[in-house]
Structures are given as C-alpha cells and as structure tokens.
Amino acid sequence: MSHADRQRAVRSSAPPLLTARELHKRFGDNEVLKGVDLTLYRGEVVVLIGPSGSGKTTVLRSLNGLETPDAGVLTLDGGPEIDFVTPPSKRTRFALRDRSAMVFQHHNLFPHLTVINNVIEGPLRVQRRPKDEVMAEARGLLARVGLSDKENAYPHELSGGQQQRVGIVRALALRPDLLLFDEPTSALDPELVGEVLIVIKELADEGWTMVVVTHELAFAREAADHVLFLDGGVVVEEGPPQQLFTAPAHERTRRFLTRIMRPLDGV
C-alpha cells in the first residue's frame, strides 16, 4: 500500500487519536509557538520538519505534558478537551504521559542502571505490572533490536546507536498509544544513524502511531504519512510527503528543502 493510500485509509476509518488546536507558547520574550494545529490518527506517522528554533520540539513536548502551552486546546482519543488557558492539573498531565512515550535526542538512560533495568523501570514502578511479564517482554523487545547480549551492560558501555535503540525499547515497553521521537538521530555519529532509522521505520510499517521530529528528510519522505513544515512557530505547510517534498506550495518550504537536500544530492 502506498503512503497516499495508507493515509487515506487511516484518516477515513476513525476519528483522530489526538487533536491540537491553536497551541501557543512563550519563553520570556520569545514566542515559540504562534497557533499550531496538529491532527493525528491511530496508526499514522506524522513527521515535523523545519529549521532549528522553529518550535518542533516544543510542539512534541506539549503533546504529552512535558511542556504546558500558554493557550490552545488538546483532545486525546475522544476524551474531554484540555484548554491550556487554565493550567491543567497534575492528574491531567500524568494522564497524557500515561498514553504516550518519548524517545529523547540524548537517550536519557539512567547511567546507574543496566540496559534491562532501564527498560523495566517504567512498567514495574509506574505501571506496576508483574515482574515476570515485564522481564519477558523486555527481553523480547531487546532481541528484536539486536541487543539481547547487552541486557546486563551499562549505558556507558554502549555505542550511541545502541543507547538510542535501548531508548526505543524502553518506550515500547510502556505499551503506549503514541510514540514521540525528538530528533532521535541528531546526537549520533553519522555511521550509527542508519541502525536507529531502520528500527523506527519498522515500527512505522507495523502501524505504531508516531510523531517524529527529525532533520533526516530522506527518512521523513519514506516513513511519514503526513508531514508538517514549521518555521517561526507556525505551520507553514503540511501534506502527504510525496506532495510536500516534490511540489511544495509555499516558497519558504521550497527554500528550506533546497538548502537541506542539495548537499545530499551530491553524496
């Protein structure tokens, strides 16, 4: 099934899993988000692209309560609207986090815990699931990303790519409805980027619901169902990847893609 067919099927089959409308966020004098809208359907991969400082990570963190917008409305899976004009309660923020899991740019593994203990920490301590069940699932997930032999290693004994794969497994172990990736390859050596992108692409092919912030445009073009181009805290343009990458409607989008993709064409 092509991306276009897949997106049409996803977007016509059910109501959105998540809707964000008119998100605004200011840090001091810097208005980072100026009315961002985002709609995400179950089983869909939405990719956010744009220059540094465009607000991509702030959008991502706003979707699971790590950042609280100053204004805007968020609806998750048909639940009650969260209106950020009134700061949400701690319970509401925790409810958002319970439904999602984030893979961070710098891995954010606990340095004093082994790989397996990093993976089982959330399911055991937060979700309070049975240890035997959690251990079996964690080992299965480590096996699928090629890290069975690293379960007793510590993060400092792993390469950056291995650490990020552990970060992905840790997120999957929480059984989230929504996976959030914040530039998961930007802190990696170029030679290690591919191994992480392969894992994320496999998750996309399996139908995981994901929002991904990335500068890897070739990956975005291949894996995304829907792409948003942000600049200056607004969504300049959005659409299916084949449309946005081959025939962007806005001059700003064209300039960004030309500058980013031109060096890649000569590699």
Residue positions per predicted region:
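C-terminal boundary and immediately downstream tail of ABC-type ATPase nucleotide-binding domains
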Residues: 2-3, 242-267
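ABC family nucleotide-binding domain
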Residues: 15-241
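ABC-family P-loop ATPase nucleotide-binding domain
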Residues: 1-24, 264-267
